[in-house]
Curated annotation (Swiss-Prot):
NCBIfam families found in the cross-reference section: Rossman fold protein, TIGR00730 family
Organism: Saccharomyces cerevisiae (strain ATCC 204508 / S288c)
InterPro entries (UniProt xref): LOG, LOG_fam
A Pfam family it matches: Lysine_decarbox
Disulphide-bonded residues: none
Cellular component terms (Gene Ontology): cytoplasm; cytosol; nucleus
An individual GO BP term: cytokinin biosynthetic process
Record-given protein name: LOG family protein YJL055W
Lineage: Eukaryota, Fungi, Dikarya, Ascomycota, Saccharomycotina
Length: 245
């Protein structure tokens, strides 16, 4: 995966002065209505601020909820979903499973087909695999937010955390801890710090928010923690250079 390093005020396709925020979340709604309500509120806040949502391209669960909310009732918001071809039939339930969208399917090879499938979900790009999906999502984003989700959400945000620790990027990483969803994970991370597998300073890579406004505030006020690995990735060719910008 490649990422861009600077998590400042630049935008990867959002409005001038706005941000592009990558949100990882579940393709289901979960057990509590509060998860869906919070996704809707966060999307509405992005819409109000003129921030762009970058997400996994699904129309179901929390993914679909935050995408529709970010677009807004007037469809003037900014959303870019990236989804692997194999997941279209599972996470794009608004589409005909036998004939998704010819223009989009052509983008599997050239990655230039950011053509809307449905206006209420903004732009969608179909890619050939998960690695390409994660790379594109990261490169398009100024910050990362994890809402409640499953294995995929955990893996995606943990990779972002690891790459920050390694000095590959400086972008804000926020756990949106709705109704204490991430409490046990945070306890485990604290345990790892106590057992000296994670340094205290590297524990500061992750910021925690409990409301949509706090998510935005944490992104805007994020300070890159000291104590991360000062590694030189220039010998890795192009594998990390986009992430280091």
């Amino acid at each position: 995966m490649t990422m861009e390093k600077n998590g400042g005020n630049s935008s990867r396709g959002g409005q001038v002065g706005g941000k592009s925020v990558c949100v990882y979340c579940g393709s289901s709604f979960g057990a509590k209505a509060l998860y869906s309500e919070s996704a809707e509120e966060l999307g509405a806040l992005f819409h109000k601020l003129g921030w762009k949502l970058v997400y996994g391209g699904g129309t179901t669960g929390l993914m679909g909820k935050i995408a529709r909310s970010t677009m807004g009732p007037d469809l003037s918001g900014q959303v870019h979903g990236i989804i692997p071809n194999a997941l279209v039939s599972k996470e794009r339930t608004d589409e005909d499973k036998e004939d998704v969208n010819k223009a989009l399917l052509e983008s599997v090879e050239n990655h230039k087909g950011a053509t809307p499938i449905s206006e209420e979900y903004g732009e969608t790009t179909i890619v050939p695999d998960m690695h390409t999906r994660k790379r594109m999502m990261a490169n398009l984003s100024d910050a990362f937010v994890a809402m409640p989700g499953g294995y995929g959400t955990f893996e995606e945000i943990m990779e972002c955390i690891t790459w920050s620790q390694l000095g590959i990027h400086n972008k804000p990483i926020i756990l949106f801890n709705i109704d204490g969803f991430y409490d046990k994970l945070l306890e485990f991370l604290k345990h790892s710090i106590q057992e000296r597998f994670i340094s205290v300073k590297n524990g500061e890579i992750i910021q925690v928010a409990s409301t949509p406004q706090e998510v935005v505030d944490k992104i805007e006020k994020y300070v890159v923690p000291e104590g991360r690995f000062n590694l030189n990735w220039s010998d890795e060719g192009h594998a990390h250079e986009d992430c280091a910008k």
